[in-house]
């Protein structure tokens, strides 16, 4: 389960300190970032000296359906090219995964988007960042990423 394995592994919190109270309520000491999609929550708390960011999205969200939506403005030329290499049915989920990476990276940096989201490179991870794809740990139809900055 994401809350019992992924978050403690990256934050250093013991698994018992991350509590899933219900599908809509998570208790985690000092949680400062969280992603919510429907009834699912993914909290994140940075340890001392670390930045932590998490994002979860629906793979079938309208924003990721084609390049005319977020895909046309939120992604770099290289990111759009990478998505175009995939079969058409896989492209919306690929856009959603790229977006969750971007969101996790800017949250871990503590900046949010300060300019053009296309300028945030979701294909190349900075040396001081650990980026984890959470998709396999989420219910079907959801994609997510968690980034930890600092050592």
Feature locations, PLM:
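Conserved nucleotide-ligand handling architecture
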Residues: 1-151
């Amino acid at each position: 389960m994401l809350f019992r394995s992924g978050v403690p592994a990256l934050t250093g919190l013991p698994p018992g300190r991350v509590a899933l109270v219900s599908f809509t309520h998570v208790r985690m000491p000092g949680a400062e970032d969280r992603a919510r999609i429907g009834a699912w929550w993914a909290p994140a708390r940075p340890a001392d000296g670390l930045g932590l960011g998490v994002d979860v999205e629906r793979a079938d969200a309208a924003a990721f359906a084609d390049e005319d939506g977020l895909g046309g403005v939120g992604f770099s030329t290289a990111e759009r090219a990478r998505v175009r290499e995939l079969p058409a049915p896989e492209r919306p989920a690929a856009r959603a995964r790229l977006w969750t990476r971007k969101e996790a990276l800017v949250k871990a940096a503590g900046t949010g988007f300060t300019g053009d989201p296309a300028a945030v490179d979701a294909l190349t991870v900075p040396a001081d960042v650990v980026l984890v794809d959470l998709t396999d740990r989420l219910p079907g139809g959801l994609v997510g990423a968690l980034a930890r900055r600092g050592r």
